[in-house]
Protein backbone atom coordinates (compact mmCIF):
# COMPACT_ATOMS: atom_id res chain seq x y z
CA UNK A 1 0.00 0.00 0.00
CA UNK A 2 1.46 3.35 -1.02
CA UNK A 3 0.33 6.44 0.85
CA UNK A 4 1.00 9.96 -0.44
CA UNK A 5 0.18 12.65 2.09
CA UNK A 6 -0.04 16.37 1.50
CA UNK A 7 2.68 18.47 3.06
CA UNK A 8 0.39 21.50 3.13
CA UNK A 9 -0.03 21.56 6.89
CA UNK A 10 2.54 19.21 8.36
CA UNK A 11 2.27 18.89 12.13
CA UNK A 12 2.43 16.38 14.95
CA UNK A 13 -0.46 14.37 16.31
CA UNK A 14 -2.63 16.05 18.91
CA UNK A 15 -3.68 13.82 21.76
CA UNK A 16 -7.41 14.42 21.50
CA UNK A 17 -7.80 13.20 17.91
CA UNK A 18 -5.46 10.25 18.28
CA UNK A 19 -7.22 9.33 21.53
CA UNK A 20 -10.53 9.12 19.67
CA UNK A 21 -9.03 6.58 17.27
CA UNK A 22 -7.28 4.66 20.05
CA UNK A 23 -10.58 4.47 21.94
CA UNK A 24 -12.25 3.08 18.80
CA UNK A 25 -9.59 0.37 18.66
CA UNK A 26 -10.36 -0.48 22.31
CA UNK A 27 -14.07 -0.82 21.56
CA UNK A 28 -13.13 -3.41 18.92
CA UNK A 29 -10.86 -5.10 21.49
CA UNK A 30 -7.87 -4.40 19.27
CA UNK A 31 -4.51 -2.89 20.05
CA UNK A 32 -2.99 -0.83 17.25
CA UNK A 33 0.23 -2.29 15.94
CA UNK A 34 3.35 -0.13 16.18
CA UNK A 35 3.39 0.24 12.37
CA UNK A 36 -0.12 1.73 12.50
CA UNK A 37 0.85 4.35 15.07
CA UNK A 38 4.02 5.07 13.11
CA UNK A 39 1.94 5.54 9.95
CA UNK A 40 -0.43 7.96 11.69
CA UNK A 41 2.51 9.96 13.01
CA UNK A 42 4.17 10.04 9.58
CA UNK A 43 0.90 11.21 8.01
CA UNK A 44 0.64 14.01 10.56
CA UNK A 45 4.11 15.18 9.51
CA UNK A 46 3.11 15.16 5.83
CA UNK A 47 5.35 12.22 5.01
CA UNK A 48 4.60 9.70 2.29
CA UNK A 49 5.46 6.05 2.46
CA UNK A 50 4.87 2.41 1.77
CA UNK A 51 2.99 0.20 4.21
CA UNK A 52 4.14 -3.40 4.01
CA UNK A 53 2.61 -5.83 6.50
CA UNK A 54 1.00 -9.28 6.40
CA UNK A 55 -2.62 -9.69 5.33
CA UNK A 56 -5.10 -8.99 8.11
CA UNK A 57 -2.82 -6.83 10.26
CA UNK A 58 -4.62 -3.54 9.67
CA UNK A 59 -2.93 -1.81 6.74
CA UNK A 60 -6.26 -0.24 5.76
CA UNK A 61 -6.75 1.36 9.17
CA UNK A 62 -3.07 2.35 9.25
CA UNK A 63 -3.61 4.38 6.07
CA UNK A 64 -7.17 5.53 6.82
CA UNK A 65 -6.91 6.80 10.39
CA UNK A 66 -4.22 9.36 9.50
CA UNK A 67 -6.46 11.52 7.29
CA UNK A 68 -9.29 11.30 9.84
CA UNK A 69 -6.98 12.30 12.70
CA UNK A 70 -5.66 15.17 10.57
CA UNK A 71 -9.21 16.40 9.89
CA UNK A 72 -10.25 16.10 13.55
CA UNK A 73 -7.10 18.02 14.56
CA UNK A 74 -7.98 20.78 12.08
CA UNK A 75 -11.49 20.91 13.52
CA UNK A 76 -10.08 21.43 17.00
CA UNK A 77 -12.74 22.59 19.46
CA UNK A 78 -15.16 23.77 16.78
CA UNK A 79 -18.53 22.00 16.65
CA UNK A 80 -18.79 19.00 14.36
CA UNK A 81 -19.93 20.26 10.95
CA UNK A 82 -23.12 18.80 9.53
CA UNK A 83 -21.85 18.91 5.96
CA UNK A 84 -19.15 16.42 4.95
CA UNK A 85 -15.75 17.75 3.95
CA UNK A 86 -14.94 17.99 0.26
CA UNK A 87 -12.79 15.31 -1.38
CA UNK A 88 -9.73 14.79 0.83
CA UNK A 89 -8.78 11.15 0.22
CA UNK A 90 -8.45 9.27 -3.06
CA UNK A 91 -8.12 5.52 -2.54
CA UNK A 92 -7.08 3.58 -5.64
CA UNK A 93 -7.31 -0.20 -5.72
CA UNK A 94 -6.96 -2.53 -8.71
CA UNK A 95 -9.81 -4.94 -7.98
CA UNK A 96 -13.53 -4.11 -8.01
CA UNK A 97 -14.19 -6.63 -5.23
CA UNK A 98 -11.56 -4.91 -3.12
CA UNK A 99 -13.25 -1.55 -3.77
CA UNK A 100 -16.40 -2.85 -2.04
CA UNK A 101 -14.50 -4.36 0.90
CA UNK A 102 -12.38 -1.25 1.36
CA UNK A 103 -15.37 1.08 1.16
CA UNK A 104 -17.09 -0.98 3.86
CA UNK A 105 -14.02 -0.84 6.16
CA UNK A 106 -13.56 2.91 5.68
CA UNK A 107 -17.24 3.61 6.32
CA UNK A 108 -17.17 1.51 9.49
CA UNK A 109 -14.60 3.76 11.14
CA UNK A 110 -16.33 6.96 9.96
CA UNK A 111 -19.75 5.78 11.16
CA UNK A 112 -18.46 4.46 14.48
CA UNK A 113 -16.73 7.79 15.17
CA UNK A 114 -19.87 9.64 13.98
CA UNK A 115 -17.89 11.79 11.57
CA UNK A 116 -19.76 13.59 8.77
CA UNK A 117 -17.46 12.12 6.11
CA UNK A 118 -18.84 10.44 3.02
CA UNK A 119 -17.08 7.39 1.58
CA UNK A 120 -18.19 6.30 -1.88
CA UNK A 121 -16.97 3.94 -4.56
CA UNK A 122 -16.62 4.51 -8.27
CA UNK A 123 -16.01 1.63 -10.66
CA UNK A 124 -17.38 0.47 -13.99
CA UNK A 125 -20.28 -1.01 -11.98
CA UNK A 126 -21.30 2.33 -10.47
CA UNK A 127 -24.56 3.59 -11.95
CA UNK A 128 -24.60 6.62 -14.20
CA UNK A 129 -26.80 8.54 -11.77
CA UNK A 130 -24.33 8.04 -8.91
CA UNK A 131 -21.40 9.03 -11.13
CA UNK A 132 -23.26 12.20 -12.17
CA UNK A 133 -24.00 13.00 -8.51
CA UNK A 134 -20.33 12.48 -7.63
CA UNK A 135 -19.22 14.85 -10.37
CA UNK A 136 -21.39 17.58 -8.81
CA UNK A 137 -20.25 16.87 -5.24
CA UNK A 138 -17.42 14.45 -4.66
CA UNK A 139 -17.43 12.38 -1.46
CA UNK A 140 -14.90 13.05 1.29
CA UNK A 141 -13.18 9.82 0.28
CA UNK A 142 -13.45 8.22 -3.15
CA UNK A 143 -12.49 4.56 -3.54
CA UNK A 144 -11.90 3.72 -7.19
CA UNK A 145 -10.02 1.63 -9.74
CA UNK A 146 -7.26 2.95 -12.02
CA UNK A 147 -9.56 2.73 -15.05
CA UNK A 148 -12.36 4.70 -13.40
CA UNK A 149 -9.84 7.27 -12.19
CA UNK A 150 -8.46 7.69 -15.73
CA UNK A 151 -11.93 8.45 -17.03
CA UNK A 152 -12.67 10.75 -14.10
CA UNK A 153 -9.52 12.75 -14.80
CA UNK A 154 -10.81 13.54 -18.28
CA UNK A 155 -13.65 15.68 -16.88
CA UNK A 156 -13.00 19.43 -16.49
CA UNK A 157 -14.59 19.65 -13.01
CA UNK A 158 -12.19 17.06 -11.62
CA UNK A 159 -9.33 19.56 -11.34
CA UNK A 160 -11.40 21.78 -9.05
CA UNK A 161 -12.69 18.81 -7.04
CA UNK A 162 -9.17 17.48 -6.54
CA UNK A 163 -7.87 20.85 -5.31
CA UNK A 164 -8.64 19.89 -1.68
CA UNK A 165 -7.21 16.40 -2.02
CA UNK A 166 -4.84 15.72 0.87
CA UNK A 167 -4.08 11.99 0.65
CA UNK A 168 -3.74 9.42 -2.12
CA UNK A 169 -3.63 5.73 -1.21
CA UNK A 170 -2.65 3.14 -3.82
CA UNK A 171 -3.76 -0.17 -2.35
CA UNK A 172 -2.43 -3.52 -3.59
CA UNK A 173 -0.02 -1.58 -5.82
CA UNK A 174 1.98 -4.72 -6.55
CA UNK A 175 -1.02 -6.03 -8.53
CA UNK A 176 -0.51 -3.15 -10.97
CA UNK A 177 3.23 -3.47 -11.52
CA UNK A 178 3.26 -6.20 -14.14
CA UNK A 179 0.22 -5.04 -16.09
CA UNK A 180 -0.59 -2.35 -18.64
CA UNK A 181 -2.59 -0.60 -15.90
CA UNK A 182 0.55 0.74 -14.17
CA UNK A 183 0.87 2.61 -10.89
Question: Where do the model's predicted regions map?
Answer:
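Conserved P-loop/Walker A NTP-binding site and adjacent catalytic elements of P-loop NTPases
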Residues: 22, 30-183
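N-terminal intrinsically disordered, low-complexity tails of helicases
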Residues: 1-38
